[in-house]
Amino acid sequence: MAAPEEKLPRKLWEHPNPQSTNMWRFIQTCNARYGLKMSTFQDLYKWSVGESRNDFWNALWSEIRLIHEGSYSRPVDPDARMDSIPEWFKGVRLNFAENILYTRGETKESRTTWDKSDDKVACTEVREGGTEVKDYTWRDLRRKVALLANAMQAQGVKKGDRVAVVASNSFDTLCVFLAVTSLGGLFSSSSTDMGTKGILDRLLQIDPVYVFFDDWAVYNGKTTDLRPKIRDILSGLAPLKNFKGVVTMPRFTYYANVSGLPNTVTLNEFLVAARGDYELRFERVEYRDPFLVVYSSGTTGVPKCIVHSVGGVLTSSMKEGKLHRDLGPQTVQLQYTTTGWIMYMSAVLSMLAGARAVLYDGSPFQPDLTAFIKVIGEQKVTNLGISPRYMHELQKNNVSPREVTDLSSLQSCTSTGMVLKDQLFEWFYDVGFPPHVQLANISGGTDLAGCFGMENPLTPVYVGGCQGPSIGTAIAVYDQTIEGGKGVKGVELEDGTPGELVAPLSFPNQPVFFWGADGAQKYYNSYFARFDDVWTHGDFIMIHPITKQIFFLGRADGVLNPSGVRFGSAEIYNVVEQFFPQVQDSICVGQRRPNDHDETVLLFLLMAPGHKFSQQLAKDVQAKIGQELSKRHVPKHVFETPEIPTTINLKKVELPVKQIVSGHTVKPSSTLMNPDSLKYYYQFADIEKLLEQGSVKSRL
């Protein structure tokens, strides 16, 4: 496996002064308050998910200092079933936008601007290639949000209404987010590169009152007029009961002419309804009231609409930001993301702590591979968020960020979106970034708007996996070979044994519901149908018995299981990437058709430009996998592929390919960036015929 028990992985980083961190100080506060003797991260984690976990949540509530009114008797009923979606901090009322735009004062209901003063820069907008850089102060932000919220209210937007954006990661998008949530409404965002069907698959389910839409988009050096897409969206949303129209936001200094579009106004025209009212007003709502709709990847159908609560996300985000990450007014956060991904929340939530958010829009590779890196240096970014795919591109092209620009301000770099391979951990420290930077491999996602595995300042960073769990959020590894079903109890495995990631205890940032008439059943089926009274997340993981790292080995539904030997596809990708530079990418799936007695592993290779696939290469790949892992890991068949299906967020999509080669017909999801790529794989459902005839079709 990726983390052998007999030896420790290579240590790459540790905090130079752990006693200076918020997490260490929090431990001392809890020790004094509850008569404890905690001294390590594991001590804190075990206490936070133990029998006294309500003590932990009480202490955390005092620590995070959210602006709120009302009071609670206990954080949660510890005996409530997890699938009942227990109510947290009942009696507390608060507002998302208020906590972003202000900081709590001396009393729980009061607010101050001490770390968000009028003249302090709140966010910086940077467009593709480091161009069009513009700073916005907290005063700018508060005034624009107030004007927009008052215009929305004048147009009838109220608590519980949905307002959507199809837009870039920009100042205007942020203002829409904060304006609708200031009124107690729900925010939903999609990126402009999504297809019309993908956007409608989302919006038709939630029936928004308004959709705020960029009028132009710029990506990868290409400028796109979005008005044809706006027209299609208007037509698609016309039957909805609550939908009033589209508001266009200017991508450039001028507005595109939208006079020919029905029910469409520009942002400036929309703001007239505010009548120049710059006073901020906040609707404080119940802790578990909804404020955000996000979406599952929808790789096998229409995406599920996951609804998160105001209090749950604020509590979880402050826990992660303040204690795990030491965020504060000195922080400069840049999360590379589109608005269509849950990581857009990460781009914004650092502002809770008074941080400056750098809102980057565009490709990180334009006009060249160093442009985005230069932005990190120029903006003196302290906390960077990127993906393994981005790091892989830098490594592949021999680009070393620390040789490109001054990264002395950078303290932490998070990576998420897919498994971070061991080779990239070592490249990060040996070649890529300064050794003082904490590489924070994190995993969690859309379902919880937070993390199951993440960094902390008290334990070292070793090669592979995540440093550890998120405090207060219990995780366990269950035996994946158990069939599961209603009422079936799972079996927890020892550390060092791979299995299925579960959360056995409720947490405040559980979604409050799924939108739609059949939302309750979809919610149950998504998380609770497999094992009784635990959240099953769908990841195949292992916890190192000594370091307690969490190794994410792949998706549980993509686990490979030839002859009863279970392993994750990430292990195969690791070997291919490390030893075969002529291969650009790969996808590995299990094939088990209705009449097959066992699963067969198929590996498809996408060749790099200028390189050709050969049977000798296939044999070399098989041999190296057997050498590096075991003979049982070796794919039975290795083929070339012209294209690998990915989502619009560039996540490799294994499940549809697995279903197709196993003899099923799959309807491509609207979230796939390249849905036609699936057609190629249908021929492998009759693999014996292909091998007999030697007639694999090499093109789509």
Residue ranges and their predicted role:
Residues 119-121, 246-249, 254, 259-295, ...:
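Conserved pre-ATP/AMP-binding loop-to-beta segment of ANL
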Residues 132, 151-194, 198-200, 334-338:
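Conserved AMP-binding/adenylate-forming
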Residues 155, 182-269, 379-380, 387-388:
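Structural core segment of the AMP-binding/adenylate-forming
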Residues 165, 191-216, 377, 384, ...:
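AMP-binding/adenylate-forming catalytic core of the ANL superfamily
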Residues 265, 271, 329, 353-355, ...:
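Gly/Ser/Thr-rich phosphate-binding loop
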Residues 312-332, 342-383, 389, 396-398:
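Conserved AMP-binding/adenylation subdomain of ANL enzymes
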Residues 483-531, 565-568, 665-666:
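Conserved ATP/PPi-binding loop(s) of AMP-dependent carboxylate-activating enzymes
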Residues 587-593, 602-604, 622-699:
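Conserved C-terminal "lid"/linker of ANL adenylate-forming enzymes
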